[in-house]
């Protein structure tokens, strides 16, 4: 007899500038450990995600890094080019990262306009956490890909809770921006009105072919960024930015699709990712390794409620309510898991399956930057990623991350209008890639939008772009 487990997780998800509730429901297949039937070499390859992960880490300090016992082997294998690029990046980060002579030289240049260029100097991109956890993970992967393409070292602002969520991803070095970084007291003040904002400098004609190269610039890549800020995605602007030692990025978006629209990047990206829809899947599994505390939440929930199921389905429901508030219809939707539990306890399914309903947590308000709340949210994302099938909601960054980590093409629930179910109510995603919700659909990229066959308008948002593999389109 088939056993179907339904796990329901509730949390509030912050997407774009709105505080939006979401409910997550999880169900899934029971697997034997993925190493069963594999020889030693195949087991090692699976442990390292086909070569994505480096060896040399102390395993007990970050159990999630090599633990594949709860997931199926991914059918998407990384190319030898991305594996080689990651190993090269690790060497670069080790040579240029915090505490090195190169890092100290680079920080001394901050505040000076006349920059010495010796050819072997290191360049950096600093990631700043913005908005909710889903937005942060999407933008972090985007910035990391930009670092790979431009041979920069990526450092992340550690002043929030990132060390409570994720282990260090790079061997024998740190991705954390040191607390004594010379610009630390200015980072929070970086905005589009700042004198070092690239878009503002363009708007004020502060940058031209004869401009002195600044030591650092701030890049504003948000859902409401101005046209001048979107010049970041233009080839000629990248040529200028390439000369700047320090870039600071604030973003709440997955802007990877538009990196593919930059001609000099596209050539590299096609080699790195011959399967276009695997960018987030590979880079997220490389970068993100939950801390032991978070991984404990995942494994305890999985082993207690999901491991014995024959099939698991994850449902992530995002509620669109304006103005943001505590509405009864929202709570009715969140508490629907209790109704499902009672229904399946009182009567069997028509085909005889055993069906269970599970709700990992019951968070009712968004509490970004509160340690335990963010840890629970991350654990729920991973539980959703461990499903066989996934249903997500329109424009949900929470859902985007789960589908990408799990290598899943979800069914996407359309946004209700006037509290009525749309017809049709959902659509199958073209790919497992997240949507760049506010892609620059005009300007320097307007002429190239229709050319690449691997870029499509998102199913869930008409101003968004996503990567697809054309042969896999439905």
UniProtKB/Swiss-Prot annotation:
GO terms for molecular function: fucosyltransferase activity; galactoside 2-alpha-L-fucosyltransferase activity. Its EC number is 2.4.1.-. InterPro entries: XG_FTase (IPR004938). The keyword Glycoprotein applies. Glycans are attached at residues 24, 39, 208. The chain crosses the membrane at residues 1-21. One of its GO terms (cellular component) is Golgi cisterna membrane. It holds the Pfam family XG_FTase. Signal peptide: none annotated. One of its GO terms (biological process) is protein glycosylation. Keywords: Cell wall biogenesis/degradation, Glycoprotein, Glycosyltransferase, Golgi apparatus, Membrane, Signal-anchor, Transferase, Transmembrane, Transmembrane helix. May be involved in cell wall biosynthesis. May act as a fucosyltransferase. PANTHER family: FUCOSYLTRANSFERASE 2-RELATED, FUCOSYLTRANSFERASE 9-RELATED. Belongs to the glycosyltransferase 37 family. This is Probable fucosyltransferase 9. It comes from Arabidopsis thaliana. The gene is FUT9.
